[in-house]
Amino acid sequence: MENNKELILSIKNIAKFFDTSKILKDISLDVYKGDVIAIIGPSGSGKSTFLRCINLLEEPTRGSLIYKGKTYFNISKCKDDFIDYARYKEDKDKYKEKLIETEDNLAIYQNKYIEDKSDKSLKKHIKEAKKAYDEVRKKPINKLDYLNNEEYQVSIKNDHPIIPNNKELNELRSKITMVFQSFNLFNNMNVLDNVILAQKLILKRKQAEAKEVAIKYLTLVNMQDRMNYRVNELSGGQKQRVAIARALAINPEIILFDEPTSALDPEMVEEVLNVMKKLASEGKTMIVVTHEMNFAKNVANKVVFMDKGLIVESGDPKEVINHPQSERLQSFLSKTK
């Protein structure tokens, strides 16, 4: 418990690797009921990837995810932990150099032949250069060739990985739902049907109940007068409000917002922020990736600053934003003013 608030989500040592790129580096975060957590940081810092890992839209490479006492995901060690990355990177760089060298050599002879087709020896050179290039291409560097399989197998025996099945994934995503930057609405359907469909697919609600709930939340976000409009007839701000209503309609415990205002025209930003402020005042738990520093400072009860796949600083919004400790956060904030 934190200030008598219930711990509902515990994220421990979440990491995400793409080949040699480590997008997330062992991130941990506890989320309590009623929290409004603003995640800030420069582009490419891993914020959106982290958000997608929280409800397993993106499967982490390792780490654990515990929602209301139930572990939905847990991998303590992964293959990447047993790969000799130094040797792999060195050999991969050599491979790239060789690939470029043989490709350039082939291009030189091909260009010479275009300029002077009378030189019959060029055909032979082209054939040999293409063979050399193809030979390199056939033998790409595979990082699994650098895996210490013996140590990895020992680790597997000692570990007890937990990977959710489809039923558990749907269960988790109905409780931790995402509002996407791109809205993810169906343009060929009207507003009301968009909100109804999500309930029928995820919660298996009957049409009458789903319609009643949809109207309730569309009214909450002040879209009751646009229920019969098609999505492509709406402004960006209106689309985002529909996306929020759709998320609320499946009764989630936590709503994840991925830069909810970044795709909007400036005059539409305030209408979406007002809806989010209202949700915060009603105690809805939210995790928001945002560039809106006023929202982070004045609405959130916790700010998390991410950079290069790490949580660099976190804490009370006014303290973090007004008195940044790290040079990286100081530099970031200086560019947002």
Regions found by a protein language model. Give the residues of each.
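The feature captures the beta-strand-to-loop junction immediately N-terminal to the Walker
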Residues: I40-P42
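Helix-to-loop junction immediately C-terminal to a conserved catalytic motif
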Residues: N55
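ABC ATPase "signature
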Residues: S314-G315
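A short, proline-enriched helix->beta-strand linker immediately N-terminal to the Walker B motif
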Residues: A249-E253
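Conserved ABC ATPase signature
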Residues: R230-L234, Q238
